Structure formats: C-alpha cells, structure tokens
Design a protein with these regions (language model features):
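Beta-strand-centric surfaces of beta-sandwich/beta-rich domains
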Residues: 1-377
Length: 377
C-alpha cells in the first residue's frame, strides 16, 4: 500500500522512482517557460503510470490579476476524455476572488513574491497516465513556468485502495435572499425576536432543509471528501449582513434529513469562532482574506478554508455538501468555492465551468454602495 507520509514515515525506503516534468529550456538557455497565447489550450505534461503526482509548483506572469479566473487548469487521469480536475487556476490554489496572497497551509502554500509561487501538495495517484493542461481564456499571452514532481512505480500494487483526486469549482452570484425582512425581525427587542424567529413566527427563519443552501460539492461514487475553500463577496450593504450564521450540512449516500453531519455556523465550519475579523492560517483551517472595516465589518471579499485531512469524510455512493448563506439563507452575496475529494474511479470533477465572464470576480466594493443601508447602530 502506498503510504502518503510526512516526517513520521520519511525514513522508510519505499520502492519508487523520483521523476519531474518541468518547463526548463531544452536548448540549455534560460527561457524556462512556455508561452500560452490568448485562447490557447496547452498540454504541459503527460506522465506515464503507475505513479503519483506529489507536488505542483507553478507561476505565471499575469497580464492582469483577473487571469487567475481566466486561466483554467485541467487534469485527466488514465486516458479519460473528461477532466477530474477543472478549475480556475487561482481557485485551485486557494486564491479566491483572483486575489494573490502569501499563505501557508498543510497542502497549499502561496509564496513570495506576492503570492506568485503557487504550490500544491495534494497527493494525486494514477494507474496508467496523467495529462495536465491549461487554457488561457484571456486575450493576452503569458509565460507559464511549472514543476510537476511525481513518483513512478513498477506495479500498480503500490496504489491499492488509492482514490483519484478530483476538484469541483462552483459559484452562485448572487445567492437568493430575504434578508431585509429578516433584519426587521432581528431589530425588534430580543423577546419578540426570539418568539418570531425561533418559534415559527416566520417559517423562513426555521430551516429544516438544504434545498436553498449554497452547494459546495455534489458528487457520486465511492470516495472521501477532503475539504473546501469558500469565498464570499458581500458586495452591497445589507442589514445584519454577517454571513457566518449559515450552517454547513453534509449528506452522505442519499440519506434523508437530518444529515449525518450538521454544523452550527459558517465560522464554526472553518474552525474559528465569534465572528472573526482577522486573517489567520492554520494547517487545516483559517481565514485567508478579510476586507472588513470598523464601519462595515463584513464588507467585500472574504476567503476561508477547512480541510478534512486528519478527519476525511467517507462516502460510498454519493455526497452533498452545502452551507446556508446567512441564517436560513437570508443573505444575497457572491459565493464561490473549490472542493477537493477522491473517488475510486476517475470521473468528471463537477459540472462544466461557466463562461469566463461568469467566472470573473466582482469589482472591489466602495465604502458605501449608492442607495444601500448605512451601518446599523
């Protein structure tokens, strides 16, 4: 069995060959990149198996930051015609909203200068082959540099019980809301608020379904769910616009309500607490991006993450991961996410990506959008 180990198993002399595919200049010169023209799809590497991709490093000189959403990364396993990984390049590496950022987690590390060194350590086994390509959905060319470090094995026996890596990117822009009416309830005195909100005064405030939640992952097959990056853009002022009261819900193998895993709030899902208003990075959870102010604490673009690496979530037939956008789905914000998971068989990693215009981030928010509510006292 292939052991994906850290320091604890580093001294074990496993049987493999160390390999790399990179963009080094085959002439011996220093043009160690490939140029990707506007509209071009380029295969960067084709790897022979059995093997396992252990580390990806990439950098590209972007014409504009929004190319983090214009450029698409795709990975195909074992000659499949559909990609198991299909994701905007920046989001694959955890850079939501096309915002470059230095950060460190257990499996993703964006490094200087200014988050341009893109690193990924998710293990990605394959039995026959791996094909890695990028598509430039912009109009301008850019130089692409890369390392794909992988192990190659004499036999696929080393890959017994290993799943294939998949990625699913999604966006809902904006989410449907009923927040102004919710805010009016909340602004009443606490007894009336509790009575109306929690004891059925308005049935919309009592959510016993995942029907209207934001979907982070919907997949069929036998596998494990390993985590997500979630990006929220509070692009306009809303009364009581803290989005963190949205509960996470994970349904396994088509089970009925209630799900096997039901959370207590968005900030609890990413293992923080009490409406965090600061950036924080830990190996398995954190806040990568926070843009709030004293006057508008939840203003603009936020990015958070939760990895299930020490506690992967097992499913055998299907999994459905969703989260409320505000309590009982009251808020209308721009939600996007990248989810990481493994399946026993290589399949398509989620629905096809939307057109590039529907992937681009919203412009950054002014302090108070015209015509929107001033801060609530």
């Amino acid at each position: 069995m292939l052991a994906f180990t850290g320091l604890g198993g580093l001294s074990r002399l496993r049987d493999y060959y160390s390999k790399r595919a990179s963009s080094w200049d085959r002439t011996g010169g220093n043009r160690d990149h490939v140029m990707i023209a506007g509209g071009e799809t380029r295969t960067l590497a084709e790897l022979n198996g059995p093997g396992c991709l252990r580390h990806i490093w990439m950098t590209l000189w972007l014409p504009h930051d929004d190319y983090l959403r214009r450029v698409v990364l795709r990975i195909f396993w074992d000659g499949q015609s559909e990609p198991s990984v299909e994701c905007p390049l920046g989001d694959f590496f955890g850079l939501g909203h096309a915002k470059r950022k230095n950060y460190v987690t257990a499996v993703m590390q964006m490094s200087p200068q200014d988050g341009r060194g893109l690193n990924c350590w998710w293990p990605m086994p394959f039995r026959k082959s791996a094909r890695i390509e990028v598509t430039n959905d912009g109009t301008e060319s850019f130089p692409q540099y890369f390392y794909f470090d992988y192990e190659q094995y004499d036999s696929d026996a080393a890959l017994a019980d290993q799943g294939y890596f998949h990625v699913q990117w999604r966006r809902e822009n904006p989410t449907d809301s009923w927040g102004d009416e919710y805010a009016e309830l909340r602004n009443q005195d606490i007894e009336k608020w509790a009575e109306k909100l929690h004891w059925g005064g308005d049935p919309r405030s009592l959510n016993l379904s995942n029907q209207d939640n934001y979907i982070m992952l919907a997949a069929s097959g036998d596998g494990i769910y390993c985590g997500s990056h979630l990006n929220v853009d509070v692009f306009e002022r809303q009364k009581n616009d803290w989005f963190g009261e949205g509960d996470d819900m994970i349904f396994i193998d088509g089970e009925p309500w209630p799900p096997s895993l039901h959370g207590t709030g968005t900030e609890d899902w990413y293992n923080c607490a009490y409406s965090p208003r600061e950036e924080y990075q830990a190996p398995y959870h954190g806040v990568l991006l926070y843009n709030g102010t004293d006057e508008w604490p939840w203003k603009g673009k936020q990015s958070v993450y939760r990895y299930y690496i020490e506690d992967p979530i097992r499913f055998r037939k299907s999994i459905h991961v969703s989260i409320e956008h505000g309590h009982a789905n009251k808020l209308g914000n721009d939600y996007s996410s990248t989810s990481y998971y493994y399946l026993r068989e290589p399949t398509r990693g989620g629905p096809p990506l939307p057109p590039v215009a529907e992937r681009l981030p919203r412009p950054d928010e002014p302090p108070y959008p015209p015509g929107k509510a001033e801060p609530r006292p």
